[in-house]
Amino acid sequence: MKLLEDRIKKDGEVLDGDVLKINSFLNHQVDPQLMMQCGEEFKRLFADQKIDKVLTCEASGIAPGVMTAYVLDVPMVFARKKKPSTLNDAVYWADVFSYTKKVNNKICVEEKLLHKGENLLIIDDFVAQGEAVKGMVNIAKQAECNIVGVGAVVAKTFQGGSDWVKQHGLHFEALASIDSFKDGQVHFGKEN
């Protein structure tokens, strides 16, 4: 998605450790118009799929997830990184390692929000090593849902997460695919 790539070139910052900082429009401050366009693009890319619900992970997956759900006219569920005190019902759990924060999280979704046989579209802000996606796939399988695809706003294809998704037979689409960071610059690829 050229608009997104241009925004990354303009406002993104490559940090040590192959980290891309895009806090000005996705990971801290959100550009709702850009996120709406991302949602529209995911709708186009997954148009051949019957989608009952969007599944994402808090916190940065919520903006693209809710916009995608909005344009698809379906609900969105987000996996929580901590079980809140208000959640007394049964939950599905999965372990997720955060690449940027270097911590292990246990993500959870209340069981009654996912139903056997539902068709889920997983949306995430970044797919790097794919840890959050792996956790959401795990939760979807526990709930006996069908995963119709995985959409990433940004995929760092050189870190293996997008390969993992494809190797598991899942339809994968990235709105911006990054092949490498060289000399502090983002180098985009064409592969989804």
Curated annotation (Swiss-Prot):
It catalyses: XMP + diphosphate = xanthine + 5-phospho-alpha-D-ribose 1-diphosphate. It is an enzyme of class 2 (transferase). InterPro entries: PRibTrfase_dom, PRTase-like, Pur/Pyrimidine_PRTase, Xanthine_PRibTrfase. One of its GO terms (molecular function) is xanthine phosphoribosyltransferase activity. Pathway: Purine metabolism; XMP biosynthesis via salvage pathway; XMP from xanthine: step 1/1. The keyword Glycosyltransferase applies. Converts the preformed base xanthine, a product of nucleic acid breakdown, to xanthosine 5'-monophosphate (XMP), so it can be reused for RNA or DNA synthesis. Belongs to the purine/pyrimidine phosphoribosyltransferase family. Xpt subfamily. Homodimer. This is Xanthine phosphoribosyltransferase. It comes from Lactobacillus helveticus (strain DPC 4571). The lineage of its organism: Bacteria, Bacillati, Bacillota, Bacilli, Lactobacillales. The gene is xpt.
